[in-house]
Amino acid sequence: MKYKSLSLLIIALLSACTLGAQNRKKVGVVLSGGGAKGVAHIGALKVIEEAGIPIDYVVGTSMGALVGGLYSIGYTPQQLDSIVNAQNWKFLLSDTPDPETTLLSEKLKEEQYLLSVPIAGKSAHVSDAGIIKGRNISQLLSELTVGYHDSISFNRLPIPFACVSDNIVNGSKVVFHNGILATAMRASMSIPGVFAPVYLNGKVLVDGGLIDNYPVDIARQMGAEIIIGVDVQNPLMKADELTSLSSVLGQIINLVGEESYRKNVKDSNIHIQVDVDGYSAASFNSEALDTLMRRGKEAAMKDWEKLIALKKEIGIGTEYRAEYPGPFKIPTRTMLDTIPSVAQISP
C-alpha cells in the first residue's frame, strides 16, 4: 500500500510538471544584425540552451537572420560553430567562381545575375547594384537549407522563424514569415553598397538593419510573451570618432533605426549586450570570429542568474530542461508546408 501511494504521488508530480510546462509563457529569441559580429549569437545560444530555456520563436536581422534561420531548422550551436570555422570567408564574401564546381552554363550567366529561384511562377534575383553580388554566400545558404528550397511557412519550421528586410522602393519594413528560406536570409543581409539587393515581387530588398536591427516587436507580434535578445550593435559614435566615410555612413544608418532600437531594448525581458569593441561588421578573419563567438558566450554567462530566474516568469521550474530540435537533418517532403506564394508583412 505504501509503494502504491508513493507511485501515485510520483505520477501526480510528473503530471503537474508536464501540465506546468504546457501552460508556460512563450519565449522568443531575438538576434540583432551586425555583420561578422553576429557570430556572437552562436555563443549566446549555447548558454541559453545550457540554461534549459525553451525557445518558441526566433527572429533575426542581417547576420542574426542567418544564424537564426539555420538554428530554426535544427542546426545546433555546436554545428553553427563548426560551419563558421570551416568557411573560407574571403571566398564567400566575393563573387569569385569555384573552378571545380562552376559549370559552363553558370559561367555564361555570371554577368547577368546571381540567384534565380522559383516563387509562385516568378523569380527572385540579385542584381549587380552592389559591390558584391553575393554569388558564393547565396550558394552556401542554399546548401545549408537543403530540404527547405520550396516556398514554405516559416511557422512550420522546427522553431517558428521570421526575419526582417527593408524595401527601399517605399521604405517599408518587410517581414518574412513565408517563402524560400535562403532567399529570406539573403534579403535580410543585403548591406547597401556592399551586397546587391534582392529583387522580389516588385520589391527591392536590402539589409533589415536599416529599419529594425533588433526586431523584438516582430517576436511580440508572433506571440512571444518573454523576450531574450542578443545584441551586437555598436553604440552611437562620438564626434571625435566620426572621422571617416565609413564611420559617418554607419552612424547615419544607426540613427535611422535608433528610436525603434531603444524601444525594443526596453521591451526585452533579458537584453544580452555583447562586447564587440575592437571589431566591425567586416571582421571575418578566423581569430576575430573565434573571439566574437567566445564573447557572445561570455555576455550570456554574465546574465546566467537572470536566465535561471526567468524560468519562474516563464512558468517552469529552475530544473526544467527544454528539448531542442537539433542536430540538423534533411526533412522529408511531408514536413514541409508548401504554399502558393510568398507572404510578406509591411506594417
What name fits each language-model region?
Residues 19-61, 69-347:
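Patatin-like phospholipase
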Residues 1-25:
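Bacterial Sec-dependent N-terminal signal peptides
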